[in-house]
Swiss-Prot record:
GO terms for cellular component: cytosolic large ribosomal subunit. This is Large ribosomal subunit protein uL11. It comes from Chlamydia muridarum (strain MoPn / Nigg). Forms part of the ribosomal stalk which helps the ribosome interact with GTP-bound translation factors. GO terms for biological process: translation.
Length: 141
């Protein structure tokens, strides 16, 4: 693949196993000339074990209209909502608290997300998770 020229990089967040040609996937890939159904089938096959998880994906489109994609870990906010069983964070995070995140949960989320974060220490990743939790109206132990 080193001889192929990259013409476009597309970043999307798609629920695992639920890629389809409807917006926003179809228009983004169609504008780049990518086979939309080919991408949807490959993505759904790769994410069939993670249904419903919101997965960031980086799609690289090459000059011959082929593509490759890299999946990342779900966003921290999504992991926090899943850990606490929430639909959404607080509308007023300073006043209305929607849950409490234990230290063990923070560490587990930080360990899972650490490969996508630009940090070396687990403690730094934990602080980033804590900050996201606070901005969502979740108390941190």
């Amino acid at each position: 693949m080193s001889n192929k020229k990259i013409i476009k990089i597309i970043k999307l967040q798609i629920p695992g196993g639920k890629a389809n040609p409807a917006p926003p996937i179809g228009p983004a890939l169609g504008a780049a000339g990518v086979n939309i159904m080919g991408f949807c089938k490959e993505f759904n096959a790769a994410t069939q074990d993670r249904p419903g998880d919101l997965l960031p994906v980086v799609i690289t489109v090459y000059s011959d209209k082929t593509f490759s994609f890299v999946m990342k870990q779900p966003p921290v906010s999504s992991l926090i909502k899943k850990a606490l069983g929430l639909e959404s964070g607080s509308k007023i995070p300073n006043r209305n608290k929607v849950g409490k995140l234990a230290r063990a949960q923070i560490t587990a989320i930080a360990e899972q997300k650490m490969k996508d974060m630009d940090v070396v220490l687990l403690e730094s990743a934990e602080r980033m998770v804590e900050g996201t939790a606070r901005s969502m109206g979740v108390d941190v132990e």
